[in-house]
Design a protein with these regions (language model features):
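N-terminal Rossmann-like FAD-binding beta1-loop-alpha1 element of flavoenzymes
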Residues: 1-15, 378, 384-389
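Glycine-rich FAD pyrophosphate-binding loop
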Residues: 7-31
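Residue-level recognition of phosphate/Mg2+-coordinating polar/acidic sites
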Residues: 8-9, 21, 42-44, 61, ...
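Short hydrophobic core segments
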Residues: 16, 118-119, 143-164, 172-173, ...
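A conserved beta-strand/loop capping segment in the N-terminal third of enzymes
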Residues: 27-98
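Short beta-strand to alpha-helix junction loop
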Residues: 56-66, 84-103, 113, 159-164, ...
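A conserved beta-strand/loop element that lines the FAD pocket in flavoprotein oxidoreductases
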Residues: 105-118, 182
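A conserved short coil-to-beta-strand element within the FAD-binding core of flavoproteins
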Residues: 114-131
């Protein structure tokens, strides 16, 4: 995206990609449908970015969902809005959009150098890094590339097999740049299930639940795995529970198995238990819990479940699931951490290296799934590219 903004302004752009092809993580993101952005109000979207919201807001307002959808349509890939407000290309896939995008960039004169890994900056005669000369390691060995500006978009450290391996972190730290530790975000959580529970329910979805950690609550469907839980509502709370696990050794999620019913409504339904009716049948018949939901209730409580309707209703609304860890960084959808916002200007230029800009997951921000990750990546790329143009004009 940054290359397109720069090339449109007449800048000669060379994209150096250390993988054999461009856009692999975009293709991965579109494997089950490319969720590009979201249609919720901008203020609500910005709030999703938590502590980084103030820094990202100007970029998202300048290039937000409307601009992103228009850009996609100009590439022959109109978008549609799903029932949840999420935005997808009409093809639902990333490949057609990526092909059209790369073809357009090439017609604009953008060149691509593949299998070329950025290794930092060349040193000036005085021994300090020279921000106008980048070093690369490629198929033809080490090279030095001089440029008026450099824009780094090296990603975080999730899914390293598609390119974002976090290898830049130590390079920037050695250059004196404050980089906050990269940690898994939007990831599965680990739970110490009993073998009998795993054998029967691994791979089974727990539908229409709400998961809460602290002040973070998200509805949706979760999937039981051999090691814990995954899925949209789990991803939404994963950063919050990760922080607790890192601090205390274990964390806890509260799962509402019937988010559409109040405690009082559950109590009224549970009041009608038939003679000799088993607890499982009672829960299934009166409040519609699925077999996996009932098993999760038993698993989380060690089968210490009250037969008293009021206590049972309260438990159904707040099933305590102990979390012993989260998925590793290389299995997370995204990563949190990155270059501290204090180390970049409003246009995401490195303060220590004037003329070098950064965008996307390299920056220290975090967001849930739902289109926010791609939107922020596109928005910061446009903002950084426009900042680079302003820099060029003044230098």
């Amino acid at each position: 995206m940054a290359a397109q903004v720069l090339a449109t302004a007449g800048v000669q752009v060379s994209v150096h990609e250390h993988m054999p092809s461009v856009g692999r993580k975009l293709l991965l993101a579109g494997r089950s449908g490319l969720n590009m952005t979201h249609t919720e109000p901008i203020a609500d979207m910005v709030a999703r970015f938590g502590p980084a919201a103030d820094r990202l807001e100007p970029a998202i307002r300048a290039f937000g969902p409307a601009q992103l959808r228009a850009w996609s349509a100009e590439l022959g890939q109109p978008t549609f809005v799903g029932s949840s407000g999420r935005v997808f290309p009409s093809s639902f896939r990333a490949a057609p959009l990526l092909r059209a995008w790369l073809a357009h960039l090439r017609t604009m004169g953008v060149s691509f150098v593949l299998r070329d890994h950025w290794t930092g900056w060349a040193l000036s005669p005085g021994g300090a890094p020279d921000s106008t000369r980048c070093t690369f390691q490629g198929i033809h060995g080490a090279t030095v590339v001089a440029a008026d500006i450099t824009l780094l978009a090296l990603g975080g450290a999730s899914w390293p097999r598609v390119g974002s391996d976090g290898g830049w972190v130590d390079l920037l730290r050695l250059a004196g740049i404050d980089v906050r530790p990269l940690r898994p975000a939007n990831c599965a959580v680990h739970v110490a299930w009993r073998a009998v529970f795993v054998d029967r329910f691994a791979g089974v979805p727990v539908k229409n639940i709400a998961v809460t950690v602290g002040s973070v609550r998200q509805r949706g469907d979760a999937m039981v795995t051999t090691r814990g839980l995954e899925g949209g509502p789990v991803y939404a709370v994963s950063s919050a529970v990760r922080d607790v696990v890192e601090r205390d050794g274990v964390g806890q999620m509260s799962i509402d198995l019937q988010p559409d019913l109040t405690v009082d409504a559950l109590v009224r339904r549970l009041a009608h238990r038939r003679s000799k009716e088993s607890l499982t049948t009672w829960l299934r018949r009166t409040i519609g819990l699925s077999p996996v939901a009932i098993a999760l209730l038993f698993e989380a409580t060690g089968r210490r479940v009250s037969n008293e309707p009021t206590e049972l209703a309260a438990l159904v609304k707040h099933v305590p699931v102990v979390v012993i860890g989260v998925a590793p960084l290389d299995r997370a959808i995204s990563s949190s951490g990155g270059i501290a916002m204090e180390g970049v200007t409003e246009s995401f230029m490195l303060r220590r290296f004037p003329g070098t800009f950064v965008a996307g997951e390299m920056l220290n921000w975090d967001a849930p799934t739902g289109g926010y990750l791609l939107q922020a990546s596109f928005s910061t790329a446009v903002a950084a590219a426009n900042g680079a143009l302003d820099w060029l004009a003044g230098h």
